[in-house]
Amino acid sequence: MIELVIVSRLLEYPDAALWQHQQETFEAIAASKNLPKEDAHALGIFLRDLTAMDPLDAQAQYSELFDRGRATSLLLFEHVHGESRDRGQAMVDLLAQYEQHGLQLNSRELPDHLPLYLEYLAQLPQSEAVEGLKDIAPILALLSARLQQRESRYAVLFDLLLKLANTAIDSDKVAEKIADEARDDTPQALDAVWEEEQVKFFADKGCGDSAITAHQRRFAGAVAPQYLNITTGGQH
């Protein structure tokens, strides 16, 4: 499915290649057989607006959106397992699937990075690719809702993936669920995460319980990321 390749590329960090090959990308969108005209048009507008930006501005916007906090992380298992040990095994299992289909990762790539997962699905027969999208549909809906809440143009890419998945997920209900969710990309929230890492460090070094308790009281209101149970239709 060429559509998955296109979206994968658009969800990657916007490097110089995006501008160099924008015409080819426009042509690939126009040639798509799985996108209705209105969706192809929306995708074309996204690409037009993105490539109209100064590359440095586009890169800064991308980093602010996807690299700060966990709520809009493009690492799929971040929204399922968090930092639990289950995440490591899930990574191993996914990596094995990639290798079975001849997809080799470099040392800096994580298997659950969404653009990489889409690249993998694009190599599969269409029916299998659609099933692969359905597997992550609750995560896609969650990310779409959070991006819409932040008025980000990137939300259109997740809406498109949900349409390709032909999923029955109610996006309005997902939006309602996260309506009062605290932002985790504010300076205060990011500082709280940093402080939490310090607590873990001090605990490992034998710091007294009183210091840890005092810290926990101070940051009791820090933002905690929501995790999904994708085996039950994306319910928390």
Q: Which residues does each predicted region cover?
A:
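Charged, alpha-helix-forming regions
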Residues: 1-112, 118-236
